[in-house]
């Protein structure tokens, strides 16, 4: 049998092992894995490289339409491809209007035409004003629903995203449980965080340490406990977003041990940055929940290696530079991190701390695909989409602003020495990024809808 592509001699991350083996691709799908697979129109030699499943980034903000001056599909998905991401799950906020019904998600589909370098699944929003329209987004094919129990959205803009109170969360969770949809939650106590933040600003406390102190660990833990209990009563599957503290992870672990259907994610910045570094970097490292101290970071690594965190995500949430101006308490909170999830975490987790390659593959791709029902994604296995990232280990480079593909070429990782490189990204059998050639094909990404899986 003749194939379209054979990838030879790479160390391939499979479900439960990593070994040197060849991969055959035909019609955009993985056709065979083994040795002496036969002939192909194209043969790639991956000697000395790790071949990983393409990353499934389950938490991205692209901001188009409506705020394309923050980030856009063209720049955002090119950055993703350069970083080894082949599928993103896009959040329903930062763009205008927020993705809260059929009409608003259709605007996103229109805005992205001809611009997607990678594939994209969608989340709908659960907000204070759309509980009667949740079914519309389910019918279109979103793979989950995002909500905030922390304060969010611009109150001066009618169609911006909004947080939910406990009643709205409970009613929404009941409806989404009936639809078989997971609820993803940003967990921080809104009233306490808001009051602590205002108190700090009024007293002139505006440093990174002051910001972190205004969003203490207990505000995350309390919110996680609350939504766990409400989701349990409502009968809804739950996913906790961007957990920043080991204490927060412990709440999820406890609920899981009691039989609750709950998963969680975290982000590279909680593992490789700490509050002192946040102070040095400045507003580019501001996010919520915040980047905490070194002791907290050590606890997060323990939870990650224990298998208590399901997936790693970027929470890519950029904005124009002027929104990062001024002091840390006033600046926009969001990190541009899409392009450097895989290389940074391969360096820090695999090379520096000895994480196994199969565990790395699960955290970066497989588990997210499973959680959100992306049946063709996240695994190097026969029948799956042929989506790979080639990683060159022990290959250090210093990230510069010019390396970045974002609309605004800034990141808290600029200046960092990263000990691994993404050399090639393949989407459904085609090279979409190559370290030498750049982006060799026109954008071929597609939207992934739940009912098409």
From Swiss-Prot:
Cofactor binding notes: Binds 2 Zn(2+) ions per subunit.
How it assembles, according to the record, is: Homotetramer.
Question: What Pfam families does this protein's entry cite?
Answer: Amidohydro_1
Molecular function GO labels = allantoinase activity; cobalt ion binding; zinc ion binding
Report the gene name.
allB
- Recorded catalytic activity of this chain's protein: (S)-allantoin + H2O = allantoate + H(+)
Q: Which GO terms describe its cellular component?
A: cytoplasm
Carrying N6-carboxylysine, the residues are 146
Question: Is Metal-binding found in the keyword set?
Answer: yes
Pathway it works in: Nitrogen metabolism; (S)-allantoin degradation; allantoate from (S)-allantoin: step 1/1
Q: What is this protein called?
A: Allantoinase
The cofactors required by this protein are: Zn(2+)
- Member of which family? Belongs to the metallo-dependent hydrolases superfamily. Allantoinase family.
Stated role: Catalyzes the conversion of allantoin (5-ureidohydantoin) to allantoic acid by hydrolytic cleavage of the five-member hydantoin ring.
EC number of this enzyme: 3.5.2.5
Entry keyword set: Hydrolase, Metal-binding, Purine metabolism, Zinc
PANTHER family in the record, alphabetically? Answer: ALLANTOINASE (PTHR43668:SF4)
